[in-house]
Amino acid sequence: MMEEVLSSSLYTQQVKKLYKVGELLGLDNETLETLSQPERIIQVKIQIRGSDGKLKTFMGWRSQHNSALGPYKGGVRYHPNVTQDEVEALSMIMTWKNSLLLLPYGGGKGGVRVDPKKLTREELEQLSRKYIQAIYKYLGSELDIPAPDVNTDSQTMAWFLDEYIKITGKVDFAVFTGKPVELGGIGVRLYSTGLGVATIAKEAANKFIGGVEEARVIIQGFGNVGYYAGKFLSEMGAKIVGVSDSKGGVINEKGIDVGKAIEIKEKTGSVINYPEGRKVTNEELLISDCDILIPAALENVINKFNAPKVKAKLIVEGANGPLTADADEIMRQRGIAVVPDILANAGGVVGSYVEWANNKMGEIISDEEAKKLIVDRMNNAFNTLYDYHQKKLEDHDLRTAAMALAVDRVVRAMKARGIL
């Protein structure tokens, strides 16, 4: 039983992907072994005094996977299911994501095993400060730069920053990204992931389906990423014909006003109450007729059972891992292009880079300038990947090509530095 759990763990899945790509790149086992292990894993015990006076204990981690291309970069999540395995796997994914986007970073990830809904604001602040007290020696604007992730936000980063300054005496705002604007954050960080998804969808549409103008788009998941992806795609001339959230969705061939849809979601709790169109389940939405499908909610929603029924001509992964390996293979056989999450949802970390770079230079950037930098970086990354795929790995899918390009860059950097 334990072997089954281990074999299906996120970390094991990532190592398998690495070895598969390593074979294509002709990497030896020694190199792959080095790449599969984090350079450092920090495990900490965090104890806080609850508002009821009782001591509460939580486990936390920070995984620093690889620093060949620069300081570690990646979010910190608060979730009851956080494990060391998950944090290590996510830090590895961040290494490849940062490499693919040509960002001057390695990969890192942090997490605390906690249900934040069960803590008061005061307890959350205490937890956040204690986490930094435990790991501050391993952080720095040129060492490891955390950011928000699941259940953490700009307020969490503000607590992190304040605690870091108190302990170290260094007033260095670039140690954390995703901060409030008052503390050197940038406004576009709010929508940078959705902007990135829309930008990639437009570029991919130009290459695979003849452009984004009038393209019919379905978005599964109407949270921050889904909403902003829809908003920007609408502005680019696409027609949003379907949206959904956890309660279900709506299809309207004439087009959905995303501004109106988000208002209805905020007022009633779900986009399923959008008045014009027909109500559908999430399962029905994924196999509805469209040109571009953007799964922006949960992982593994497109699998071997529904992949043969998907009618989209192009899939852009807004969520992390929305397609299973079986679904990937089915899409490849059907000739449906899939732009992988490692690129499609990387707008968030590009936004973080813009914030970090401006903090380092002591500059204040306008939202328009920041937006342009994110769009340009995403466009360049997509076109570089597309060319690499066409020239070197045309027989494989875009996901394999993205991983190969990212791993190759890290290996070259490690060789140049004499690590390998």
Curated annotation (Swiss-Prot):
The modification N-acetylmethionine is found at M2. Methylation of lysine residues may play a role in the thermal stability of this enzyme. InterPro entries: Aminoacid_DH-like_N_sf (IPR046346), Glu/Leu/Phe/Val/Trp_DH (IPR006095), Glu/Leu/Phe/Val/Trp_DH_C (IPR006096), Glu/Leu/Phe/Val/Trp_DH_dimer (IPR006097), Glu/Leu/Phe/Val_DH_AS (IPR033524), Glu_DH (IPR014362), NAD(P)-bd_dom_sf (IPR036291), NAD_bind_Glu_DH (IPR033922). The modification N6-methyllysine is found at K254, K260, K372, K391, K392. GO terms for biological process: glutamate catabolic process. The keyword NAD applies. The active site is at K109. PROSITE patterns: GLFV_DEHYDROGENASE. One of its GO terms (molecular function) is glutamate dehydrogenase (NAD+) activity. Keywords: Acetylation, Methylation, NAD, NADP, Oxidoreductase. Pfam families: ELFV_dehydrog, ELFV_dehydrog_N. It catalyses: L-glutamate + NAD(+) + H2O = 2-oxoglutarate + NH4(+) + NADH + H(+); L-glutamate + NADP(+) + H2O = 2-oxoglutarate + NH4(+) + NADPH + H(+). SMART domains: ELFV_dehydrog (SM00839). It is an enzyme of class 1 (oxidoreductase). Its EC number is 1.4.1.3. Belongs to the Glu/Leu/Phe/Val dehydrogenases family. Homohexamer. This is Glutamate dehydrogenase 2. It comes from Saccharolobus solfataricus (strain ATCC 35092 / DSM 1617 / JCM 11322 / P2) (Sulfolobus solfataricus). The gene is gdhA-2.
